[in-house]
Amino acid sequence: MLLQIDRVLTTEELNQLNTLLQAGVFEDGKWTAGIYAKTVKDNQQLVQEGEEYRVASEIVLSALSRNQLFQAYVQPKIIGPLLFSRYEVGMAYGTHTDNALMGSGDQLRRSDVSLTIFLNDPFAYEGGALVLDTSLGEQYFKLPAGSMIVYPSIFLHRVETVSKGVRLVAVAWVQSLIRDPLERELLFELDTVRRSLFEKQGKTVDFDLLCKVYSNLLRKWAEI
């Protein structure tokens, strides 16, 4: 299941992020790619040692933590690493799959869910669409600034060549409490139904039963 979430970042946060990215130092993005993906990766990334990266990461992580739709859909256990990517004219990221495991040692984590937050509007650049190769065919995403696309990390995907302007995005990977994407989707749909039922009817017997089913499935599937 793919999920588009609009207005994840406020206008003030977007302005802060763009100021930080303008002041920050960027480096070749290949160093964060896997051994095969780096052969098709051509972009720049904000260096992670700088103050700009620290502050920008805090802004994005705060936005994700307060977004109820993201929390309900993803069931995040670990979010990271965060990357702030810049694509200038001629840059692209060819077809690839995300590494199943990221980090090392105590920081080793599984990539269950991928996300891209768009930091500038589509009219600021030409090309640069995120393309996911799904069972329904290729799906193209080029969203307004502050909007986000969230998807299971199982898909082949690419970023089309930027032909004009500059594309700015934040990307991250999440280890979910729920490893299986189908189980994660079922829990999300159950949660959506119970919230809707509560808003319409309040705390009824049916609502309590849904809560019981949701809680027991979460207990069965969650990996702590």
UniProtKB/Swiss-Prot annotation:
Recite the UniProt cofactor note for this protein. Binds 1 Fe(2+) ion per subunit.
Q: Which SMART domains match?
A: P4Hc
Keyword Oxidoreductase in annotation: yes
Fe2OG dioxygenase domain residues: 77-176
Which Enzyme Commission numbers does its entry carry?
1.14.11.-
- Pfam families the UniProt entry points to: 2OG-FeII_Oxy_3 (PF13640), PKHD_C (PF18331)
Q: What is this protein called?
A: PKHD-type hydroxylase tll1907
Q: What species is this protein from?
A: Thermosynechococcus vestitus (strain NIES-2133 / IAM M-273 / BP-1)
